[in-house]
Structure formats: structure tokens, C-alpha cells
């Protein structure tokens, strides 16, 4: 997803550098893609981000800033960096280029296992499940795509079941500890999952 988005940037956006927020793998995807393309990257990570992910992201050449207790707080800081440093924001899930790139995962899966009936996909902000569901349904309309969330962050479950469970707390699955599903992936998820 991150590489697909980075490849879509124009020269001005590349020259200004990129910024993203993530407590998960998106941070490393952006840092890796930026390094490949020679683009300066800044990643904002919430306080609860595991040290291993912080270290891996810095090892890939990104400037890492730890800010906020949640992804929402990290995103607010990213938005301020977009303004003050003139950086290009690479959103982890609410972006069509990110979603399209994440769908390529299904190509790899079906190449090795052509007869898959189900895909169990982790759900944070919804980008991964949106992208994989588009590609899966395109290749096999009968494949079932099932979203998996932590009990502490049931944002998609709440949408489908009119639930009112709060999204909060500490989980080992911090990469999918997202309080709100993105509006772009949600419209896709409602049709495919």
C-alpha cells in the first residue's frame, strides 16, 4: 500500500518529503518506500508503539516522532507537520492508492492457494480489508472476506451491529488498535465483507 501511494506522488510532493502516522506496519512501509525512492520521511507514532517497530522504522531512515496516546492524537500532530513543514501526508488506510496497493496481497495468496474459500483479514482503519476484499471479489466472487478485530477495538463490529462498545485500552495488536474506520474503506467494506 505505502509503495503504491509513494509511486503516485508528483515531483513537488516527493521533494517536500512525506509524513505518516502509524503504530503498525504502515510506518515501516512508508520508511522503506521513501528510502527506495530517496524521499525524506517523518513518521509520528503514539506513545504505546513497541520499541521494535520504532527501531525498525528508524533503521529504514525515517525520522520518528513519538506523540500522543492514540492514533487520533498522532494524526493531529501529523496534520500540523503538513502545515509547518510542507510535508505530504501518507494516510495509513483512508486513501485509495493505499487501498489499491494493499489489494495485491490477495494476488500473492491466490497464486499459492488457488482454492481459498475464506480470507481472515485484520481490521484497524479498514484499508487492508478494503483492498483485499476488492481484489478477492474480482478474482473469485464466491470468496468470503471476514474481518478480525481485538475485543478492545471493535470499530467495524460496532458499525455492522449497531454496537456502542468503546474502542480503548492496551492490546498486543497495537497495529489494529484504531478507533474509527476510514470513510473510504468503509464504503468498500460495506459492499464486500
What kind of feature is each model-predicted range?
Residues 1-193:
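PLP-dependent amino-acid enzyme catalytic core
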